[in-house]
Amino acid sequence: MKNLTNEQKEFLLSTIRDVPDFPKPGIVFKDITTLLNNASAFTMLMEHLEERYKEKNIDFVAGIESRGFIFGAALATRLGIGFVPVRKKGKLPYTTISEKYALEYGVDEIEIHIDAFRGEGKRVLLIDDLIATGGTAQAAAKLIQKTGQELVEACFIINLKFLNGEEKLKKLTNIYSVLEIA
């Protein structure tokens, strides 16, 4: 598999906009919409992910709400496999299975349809745009495993390494980040 060069990584990083003090003071939000509307960057990223995963015999890509839907659905289409949305509680119309996770001030919950993977033992790739503290990704990984699936890897476009989010996932699955911000 061909890795991205440092020049390619720098190009991708240059297409991501920093938005200071969003959603609250002191946070620098990584806005990927500027990567998405750059056809060269989005194509390069999707080609890289397709190359990485095309030989891994993955059955489904599961994307975390909401930006994980964008990358996950695009990758699933390129791989010719199904896509499963991991949603916030109350957003799916059919019977669901859920997993709770801790927030800074409280608890949140994500869910998938009970029949999302059409049986057990499927090979699943989890994807999201960014890993920060890792709480949502950890809950999504547990949720996938709770349904009897094999979680092949958790993939993130951006890893904010200084927040140590990957520590919560290391015991559950392999982790791959396209871009890392120290």
Curated annotation (Swiss-Prot):
Keywords linked to the UniProt accession: Cytoplasm, Glycosyltransferase, Purine salvage, Transferase
GO cellular component entries: cytoplasm
Protein family according to the UniProt entry: Belongs to the purine/pyrimidine phosphoribosyltransferase family.
CDD domains noted in UniProt: PRTases_typeI
Entry's Gene Ontology molecular function annotations: adenine binding; adenine phosphoribosyltransferase activity; AMP binding
GO term, biological process aspect, one: purine ribonucleoside salvage
Species of the source: Nitratiruptor sp. (strain SB155-2)
Protein name per its UniProtKB record: Adenine phosphoribosyltransferase
Pfam families on file: Pribosyltran
Annotated NCBIfam families: apt (TIGR01090), PRK02304.1-3 (NF002634), PRK02304.1-5 (NF002636)
Location in or out of the cell: Cytoplasm
Subunit structure: Homodimer.
Job of this protein: Catalyzes a salvage reaction resulting in the formation of AMP, that is energically less costly than de novo synthesis.
Organism superkingdom: Bacteria
Reactions catalysed: AMP + diphosphate = 5-phospho-alpha-D-ribose 1-diphosphate + adenine
EC main group: transferase
EC numbers, comma separated: 2.4.2.7
